[in-house]
UniProtKB/Swiss-Prot annotation:
Protein name from the UniProt record: Aspartyl/glutamyl-tRNA(Asn/Gln) amidotransferase subunit B
EC identifiers of the protein: 6.3.5.-
Top-level taxonomic group: Archaea
GO molecular function: asparaginyl-tRNA synthase (glutamine-hydrolyzing) activity; ATP binding; glutaminyl-tRNA synthase (glutamine-hydrolyzing) activity
Originating species: Methanococcoides burtonii (strain DSM 6242 / NBRC 107633 / OCM 468 / ACE-M)
Alphabetic keyword roster: ATP-binding, Ligase, Nucleotide-binding, Protein biosynthesis
One GO process term, biological-process aspect: translation
Family statement: Belongs to the GatB/GatE family. GatB subfamily.
InterPro entries cross-referenced by the UniProt entry: Asn/Gln-tRNA_amidoTrfase_suB/E (IPR017959), Asn/Gln-tRNA_Trfase_suB/E_cat (IPR006075), Asn/Gln_amidotransferase (IPR018027), Asn/Gln_tRNA_amidoTrase-B-like (IPR003789), GatB (IPR004413), GatB_C_1 (IPR042114), GatB_Yqey_C_2 (IPR023168), Gln-tRNA_amidoTrfase_suB_CS (IPR017958)
Gene: gatB
Catalytic activity line of the entry: L-glutamyl-tRNA(Gln) + L-glutamine + ATP + H2O = L-glutaminyl-tRNA(Gln) + L-glutamate + ADP + phosphate + H(+); L-aspartyl-tRNA(Asn) + L-glutamine + ATP + H2O = L-asparaginyl-tRNA(Asn) + L-glutamate + ADP + phosphate + 2 H(+)
Length: 473
């Protein structure tokens, strides 16, 4: 099926990634570990823009930017350069932002996502380095604030801005692109995505070939999807009423789910870019071969290898590789038990229980899941009981055998199951008659009653076989 886009929706994203796994900021020696600190305590003359303070480039930040570019299939330039982007805003103490203009460090890349009609390529225009401004803390909402406080702890943090072409055609595609980008960045270990402000999105949205509006500083992937959906509907409704979409910058109000006009969109000439006189151009192409050697296995390559090496399903491989920690966890488990069985238990069962509790895979040990799987494979507990063991460990702690012993979960067999089957038949005459009359679903009910009597410790397949045999005799 070919996806049709009758409204001509075009979405391009500018994603600002804070390289917070570095020890120091982009151009000074201030610590990056400011998130739990008092405001304005991780600052110095450089990141405060005091007269006479001179910047020094963080080499590790440059290496991280090149690594990100390579992972996004970008070309690394031979020589790159910093520029001053001149504008006044309270969170920018220097009166300009040190960024890159016509010599970005990488460009011309691509990311492949699942589109509306199969695989879809999102082109990467460029990715460039810049410094983060400070943080404005509004007293009240942004549009009705009684005052604004400024925290400069964030000022000068190393950022890489990843700019896409307007290749996304729906809010869902934009969300998938962001998820894929986050996945790649996690594998590169260049940032901690759990920290506030580590990944911020500006969305450029247009419909029906009209002007684009830019929605700034969206803080989450879900928020970006909602903001883009609202903006598409706003522009379509405006055009249908005979109005005109103007090029402007808008803010997304998370609480109300709406975008609000902030200002008319500036052009590049408004920023009066010029080369940063305190920083010389850098020749970075010579660094590329060594950095490429350090690139880890990326999500798409890992997914293909897991399918080939362990013979697991593509669905399981996607679930496992969506988080590098889960993928690594799985490979340890797959070395100890049958890989396809391990795939089911890690990708479906354990990951589902972790997601339900908003926990990471670090909350469970490979030794515990291996022991639980072996209990099932060795016919000592049922699958239902094994799930109960996982839930109990996550909620209350303990080891698999402690939980099995305390809750009496060892599998029951023989006479115990036969007796439960006989009691179930005797106590559920209506369901028995329905089954004998051809209602197959009544058998499922009877199996459930046997499982209930044995507290989930009987083998459901065996219970079904015994029921069928008894009812046909």
């Amino acid at each position: 099926m070919v996806y049709e886009n009758p409204d001509g929706v075009m979405v391009g994203l500018e994603v600002h990634v804070q390289l917070n796994n570095l020890n120091t900021k982009m151009f000074c020696g201030c610590s990056t570990q400011y998130h739990d600190s008092e405001p304005n305590t991780h600052v110095c003359p450089v990141c405060m823009g005091l007269p006479g303070a001179l910047p020094v480039i963080n080499k590790r930040a440059v290496e991280s930017a090149i690594k990100i570019g390579m992972a996004l299939n970008c070309e690394v330039v031979e020589q790159t350069q910093f520029h001053r982007k001149n504008y006044y805003y309270p969170d920018l103490p220097k009166g300009f932002q040190t960024t890159q203009y016509d010599f970005p460090i990488v460009g011309n890349g691509k990311v492949v996502i699942e589109g509306e009609d199969g695989e879809h390529v999102v082109r990467i225009t460029r990715a460039h380095m810049e410094e983060d401004p400070g943080k404005l803390v509004h007293i009240g909402s942004i549009d009705k604030s009684k005052g604004t406080l400024i925290d400069y702890n964030r000022s000068g943090m190393a950022l890489i801005e990843i700019v896409s072409e307007p290749d996304m055609r729906s809010p869902k595609e934009a969300r998938r692109y962001l998820d894929k980008l986050r996945n790649i960045l996690d594998y590169l270990d260049v940032f901690n995505g759990d920290l506030e402000g580590s990944m911020r999105v500006d969305a450029n949205v247009s419909v029906m070939g009209g002007q684009r509006a830019e929605v700034k500083n969206i803080s989450s992937h879900k928020g970006a999807e909602r903001a883009i959906l609202y903006e598409i509907m706003r522009q379509k409704n405006l055009l249908r009423r005979g109005g005109e979409v103007v090029m402007e910058t808008r803010h997304f109000d998370e609480a109300r789910g709406v975008t609000i006009s902030m200002r008319t969109k500036e052009g590049e000439h408004d920023y009066r870019y010029f080369p940063e006189p305190d920083l010389v151009p850098m020749r970075v192409s010579d660094w590329a071969p060594a950095i490429r050697e350090e690139l880890p296995e990326l999500p798409d390559a890992k997914r293909a290898r897991l399918i080939s090496e362990y013979d697991i399903t593509e669905m399981h491989a996607k679930a496992l590789t969506s988080d590098i920690r889960v993928a690594d966890f799985y490979e340890v488990v797959a070395a100890a038990v049958e890989p396809r069985v391990a795939g089911t238990w890690v990708a479906d069962v354990l990951k589902g229980e972790l997601n339900y509790r908003d926990l990471s895979v670090d909350s469970f040990t490979t030794d515990d899941i291996i022991q639980i799987i072996k209990l099932v494979v060795e016919d000592k507990v049922t699958e239902q009981s094994a799930v109960d063991v996982i839930r109990t460990i996550l909620d209350d702690g303990g080891t698999p055998m402690e939980v099995v012993t305390e809750k009496g979960l060892l599998k029951v067999k023989g006479d115990v199951v036969t007796e439960a089957v006989s009691e179930t038949i005797a106590e559920n005459e209506a369901a028995v008659q329905d089954y004998l009359g051809g209602a197959e679903k009544s058998l499922n009910f009877l199996v459930g009653q046997v499982m209930k009597k044995t507290k989930g410790r009987a083998d459901a397949r065996q219970a079904r076989e015994l029921l069928v045999a008894a009812l046909k005799s």
